[in-house]
Amino acid sequence: MSFLRKMLLLCSTVCSLFIFAVSASAMSFSADIYSSDGQNGKIYMDSGKVRMETSEMISITRPDKMLVWLLMPETKMYLEQALNPADPKNKPMPSNESAPGEIDRVFILKETVNGYASDKYKVTINDQGSHYEWISSDPGITMSVKTAAIDSSWWNEYRNISLVTPDPALFEIPPGYVKMSMPGMSGMAY
């Protein structure tokens, strides 16, 4: 697989995980992320800043700087992309608000997900169809703890949630990393 294809695949994975994370953006926390596709990782969030780690790449989203950094630890290099403020998925929202494009949210039942008392909803988004979302109702953890396809073909969930504020250094480019550019990607914005 070419380097560019690999980068685009990783960017796609990180973006899909970011959509899952945005509902908890008002909180400071860290958690393990588990996905049905095996792209497991770690998320750190504080004041709208998001760091997502997978086995291949680290993504740091900085709304305050309107940037996304994609770090490749293996090569100590990073890509920098503009964060598009007009894109609705980049706007932080508490979990009790509608998702971008959401047209319906129906309460299904109360159940426990990974030890968190949660309310299960069927959420319909205009161009993406419907999925299930579990919102924790535990005090202090008002966030989406799991999302899943109606047909169970995919799912993402947070486990081992810690409400400790992450180290601010996690939201910066580590020392020793070199900025790289990729032709054709300079105008892309998330």
Give a label for each model feature.
Residues 1-5:
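N-terminal secretory signal peptides that target proteins for export/translocation
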Residues 101-104, 109-119, 127-132, 137-190:
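Non-transmembrane domains of secretory- and envelope-associated proteins
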